[in-house]
Amino acid sequence: MVDQPLRSFYMYDAVGVYQTQADLQKYPVMQNSKVGDVRYRDANGDGVINDSDRTLMGKPDPDYTFGITNTFKYKNFDLSFLITAQTGGQIYSVLGRAMDRPGMGANGNVLSHWKNMWKSEAEPGDGKTPGIDNANTGQFYDSRWLYSTDFIKLKNVTLGYRIPFKKKLIQNARVYLTGENLLMWDKYEGGFSPEANNGGSTGDYDYGSYPQARVITLGVNVTF
């Protein structure tokens, strides 16, 4: 799209569920829509839901990235940390869609949010979760699996202690304990981490990628 970020997400915007037969008359519908299907936003306002109603829903690149680092020293001790953060980007959970779209059926294990699904007009659910056997809209890429990649992360913490030596054989020694990728605060529910993706350098979709490993390192530096 002209004047839009590269690799932008262009898809249907899911705004609810057709909960009753009256909803099919009240709201714009897609061909073969039925009660219990996902309801999409009529982006162009023509009263019909079709390919022309796909719209720009986000982009993988964050608007801002942040970082803060510092080192504290007290006598022979030192403590350093690195905190990183970002805001304004999105990621598409392909794994979530593969496992969780309508039409997959209710005969196997399903995610917990299906407890609130549409079952009938008498049991319409939460108004956001369609019928699990309603396959009409399950084939489409839509905003239900598009997530924010905003996060704050404790990337690195190192605690060190310098051992004093009076003899000249060893000039200096420092013992340290380092933790990497210790904590992350985010709202991503489509996978393990908003940093994990299968898009390579593009970072636009996640198909169950592993998060960055948490690493604990104990080491010693010695100067002779």
Protein language model features and the residues they cover:
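Residues that define the transmembrane beta-barrel architecture of outer-membrane proteins
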Residues: 62-66, 150-155, 171, 212-216
